[in-house]
């Protein structure tokens, strides 16, 4: 009988962990990044790597910033090559996965659920 839930392999989890740590490091240093990201504190909430290890979906949450989500996405997109090169130096693989950034709606959804529960 097949499993209904798909679990990540050990390699996916390990690569996601390495990418998460590398992203935190490069965002903390601020080198090689779009200048708009210098005063924009971001939290990397999770990294999900596809089964073929070719795509890393990185979810972020900004805090206390004047930038819109679209501006942050644009700045991250402009910095993608530098970030990918930094990650390539951290992993021991033939190729580096394509990094894709996504705004993490989980916090917003949790607030909406909490408000709905208060109204019951």
Swiss-Prot record:
One of its GO terms (cellular component) is cytosol. Keywords: Cytoplasm, Ribosome biogenesis. GO terms for biological process: maturation of SSU-rRNA. Gene3D superfamilies: 3.30.300.20. It is found in: Cytoplasm. Transmembrane segments: none annotated. InterPro entries: KH_dom-like_a/b, RbfA, RbfA_dom_sf, Ribosome-bd_factorA_CS. PROSITE patterns: RBFA. One of several proteins that assist in the late maturation steps of the functional core of the 30S ribosomal subunit. Associates with free 30S ribosomal subunits (but not with 30S subunits that are part of 70S ribosomes or polysomes). Required for efficient processing of 16S rRNA. May interact with the 5'-terminal helix region of 16S rRNA. NCBIfam families: PRK00521.2-2 (NF001799), rbfA (TIGR00082). Monomer. Binds 30S ribosomal subunits, but not 50S ribosomal subunits or 70S ribosomes. HAMAP family: RbfA (MF_00003). This is Ribosome-binding factor A. It comes from Rickettsia felis (strain ATCC VR-1525 / URRWXCal2) (Rickettsia azadi).
